[in-house]
């Protein structure tokens, strides 16, 4: 392939993908980690301060899952504001995809030590935010949606295995 063909191929991809600077991607990873930390903290607080005292008289089997969903929604709002501030393309799609892909995280890590649940929450949110920020770079909306929905479905299927 000569230089002309290489530059034409590069120009085609430039038209199909929104540019994501390495610094911007690093900010998204940090923001995802912060969101994971917020989810972890809020899950604990919502479970201990709201769900168990108000709704559980005895054994409460779904308290962690419900608290995790509430925490995911609240932390998603914080993550959305951060992504908008960073200037990422399609921030709402990133937050929704990460929330759906990681929905039930509190239930997945239930029974682990607190430091393990903290690690997995921070790591998985950082990875999810970075991955979805990368996938939504596709300029046409429909192909971007197809890719994101496909990845979310794969994440949910692998989560059940």
What kind of region is each of these model predictions?
Residues 50-63, 75-87, 103-112:
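Short juxtamembrane and helix-loop transition motifs at transmembrane-helix boundaries
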Residues 28, 85-96, 140-143:
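Membrane-interfacial loop-to-transmembrane alpha-helix junctions, especially the N-terminal start
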Residues 130-161:
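Terminal transmembrane helical module of multi-pass membrane proteins
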Residues 29-76:
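Hydrophobic transmembrane helix segments
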Residues 1-30:
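N-terminal juxtamembrane cytosolic/stromal segments of multi-pass membrane proteins
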Residues 37-43, 97-109, 148-160:
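Aromatic-anchored segments of alpha-helical transmembrane domains
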Residues 88-131:
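Short alpha-helical packing/oligomerization segments
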Residues 67-82, 120-125:
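Hydrophobic alpha-helical transmembrane segments
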């Amino acid at each position: 392939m000569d230089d002309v063909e290489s530059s034409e191929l590069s120009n085609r991809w430039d038209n199909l993908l929104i540019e994501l600077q390495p610094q911007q991607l690093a900010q998204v990873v940090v923001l995802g980690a912060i969101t994971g930390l917020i989810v972890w903290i809020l899950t604990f607080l919502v479970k201990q301060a709201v769900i168990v005292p108000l709704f559980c008289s005895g054994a409460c089997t779904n308290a962690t899952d419900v608290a995790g969903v509430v925490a995911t929604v609240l932390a998603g709002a914080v993550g959305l504001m951060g992504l908008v501030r960073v200037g990422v393309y399609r921030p709402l799609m990133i937050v929704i995809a990460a929330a759906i892909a990681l929905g039930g995280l509190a239930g997945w890590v239930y029974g682990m030590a607190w430091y393990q649940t903290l690690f997995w929450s921070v790591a998985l949110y950082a990875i999810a935010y970075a991955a979805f920020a990368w996938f939504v770079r596709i300029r046409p909306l429909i192909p971007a949606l197809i890719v994101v929905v496909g990845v979310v479905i794969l994440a949910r299927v692998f989560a059940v295995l």
